[in-house]
UniProtKB/Swiss-Prot annotation:
Belongs to the cyclin family. Cyclin AB subfamily. It comes from Saccharomyces cerevisiae (strain ATCC 204508 / S288c). SMART domains: CYCLIN, Cyclin_C. It comes from the Eukaryota. This is S-phase entry cyclin-6. One of its GO terms (molecular function) is cyclin-dependent protein serine/threonine kinase regulator activity. Residues 63-91 are annotated as: Disordered. One of its GO terms (cellular component) is nucleus.
């Protein structure tokens, strides 16, 4: 198998014995902590445009308290003009501009398409926003050095980089990679794993994700082969049962790509922007600084950066707030901080993710890495 990536054991990476946590058991379970409850922000309601005596004023939106007074004023003016036999059109002398917080209902355009199930879209995504909170790791076990499950960021980066390479060689779906990383992080956030069992855990998470997402998955012998002896077929099967039971068989992840596609609707489905957003989102998921953030939040961050790369003057208006699940940049100062941190990490990486960069340098992914990297380097 020429396409099989080199095992971790052949890579020039030094691992200290102190990186290994846990001496007695390969997988040692400690009770799971409660996850943080995050709820998406609510969106602003539509204001209704009014008609005054059959004269439609499309560009002016009037407050409710002012509507009746202006209507009476226009009626008096009209009678006065008619009494003077004037034929000039009646127009207000001044028009006060009123800021209107509205979002465009783009789902209504797809009502006639049965495949888009537009009438159920809001209910579906409301469920996904609730479900994604349940699928988060209990905490960021990489950044929390006081955690009993703490693992060095360099070790996770090594595992993720190898996982991306194996995923690419097996020609799996993007959703499979995201689910595998989610399973890995959730398990490591509540279990202590010995160093020599980390690769077994990594390939097992990919094996579970393939079973869940793929129509035709590689043979289990191929999963064991790419580990170069670190995992056996029997070992993968036993680890699979242990991982699933530890996670309560809860593996239905609201996929980050669903949120990217949702926000992309507000961007008129721009292919170039969405390709850049896919790379940025995949990078953020692989990066050790953002594993505690919701997929919808990472999707919004990725689309925001991608749109800025495409057009520096792009705005995150009410439509984007609605289709991102209520993420308002102006009222969320942490959002801008995470954006700056992500841009900085892409420009000057803290972790080794060479396989991911190489993946998005290829023509089949639009070679978007170069454009994203150049922009981030200028903005850092």
């Amino acid at each position: 198998m020429n396409c099989i990536p080199s095992p971790i054991s052949e890579r020039k990476i030094q691992i200290n014995n102190e990186d290994c946590i846990g001496k007695e058991n390969a997988f040692h379970t400690i009770p799971r902590e409660s996850s943080i409850n995050l709820t998406p922000h609510s969106t602003n309601e539509k204001k209704v445009l009014s008609e005054v005596n059959s004269n439609k004023i499309d560009s002016l939106q009037l407050p409710r308290g002012k509507l009746q007074r202006d209507s009476t004023h226009l009626e008096k003016t009209r009678k006065r003009q008619l009494s003077n036999d004037s034929t000039d059109p009646i127009e207000p002398k001044t028009v006060k501009k009123i800021k209107c917080h509205q979002w465009k209902n783009l789902d209504s355009i797809e009502m006639d398409d049965p495949f888009m199930v537009a009438e159920y879209t809001d209910s579906i995504f409301s469920h996904l926003y609730e479900k994604e909170i349940q699928m988060l790791p209990t905490h960021n076990y990489l950044m929390d050095t006081q955690s009993p499950y703490h693992l060095k960021s360099s070790m996770r980066a090594l595992l993720i980089d190898w996982l991306v390479e194996v995923h690419e060689k097996f020609h799996c779906l993007p959703e499979t990679l995201f689910l595998a990383i989610n399973l890995l992080d959730r398990f490591l956030s509540q279990n202590v794993v010995k160093l020599n069992k980390l690769q077994l855990l990594c390939i097992t998470c990919l094996f579970i994700a393939c079973k869940f997402e793929e129509v035709k998955l590689p043979k289990i012998t191929n999963f064991a082969y790419v580990t170069d002896g670190a995992a056996t077929v029997e070992g993968i099967r036993k680890a699979e049962l242990f991982v699933l039971s530890s996670l309560g068989y809860n593996i239905s992840l609201p996929n980050p790509l669903n949120f990217i596609r949702r926000i992309s609707k507000a961007d008129n489905y721009c292919i170039e922007t969405r390709n850049m957003a896919k790379f940025i989102m995949e990078y953020s998921i692989c990066c050790n600084k953002f594993i505690h953030l919701k997929p919808s939040y990472l999707a919004a961050m990725s689309m925001y950066i991608a749109r800025k790369i495409k057009n520096e003057n792009s705005k995150w208006d009410e439509t984007f707030i609605h289709y991102s699940g209520g993420i308002d940049i102006e009222s969320d100062p942490a959002f801008k901080d995470f954006i700056s941190e992500l841009v900085e990490d892409i420009a000057v990486p803290d972790t080794n993710l060479d396989s991911l960069r190489l993946k998005y340098k290829k023509p089949k992914h639009g070679m978007v890495y170069f454009k994203v990297f150049d922009w981030c380097k200028q903005k850092r």
